[in-house]
């Protein structure tokens, strides 16, 4: 599912989930507004993102943005799932992961955040699968 999908699904359906583990999350929704049809990034191209999020100009203001979901759930007084995040310090997604961690902290949402050397690959994810599972069952 990926880290973004885990966050989006767990937050959107927070009554069904008590914990979310998100590794190397593609939290790039803020960057999509400026994409043009000919643009691409290391993950995908404009058409891919438009197919997933619809109008890229408004995506960051809608509930496809995990930040919007957090704000909505907090405003409604709903309990949020606990969140475990990990991202490699050399991963091209490190800055959006740090920004989301900071957003959660500023919003008063606890987050077990982990960062260590690594890129966006299975070597890094394998390092954090066991700790994430231990955290989930602990």
Region annotations inferred by a language model:
Residues 1-138:
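Non-catalytic cap/lid and distal C-terminal segments of serine-dependent acyl enzymes
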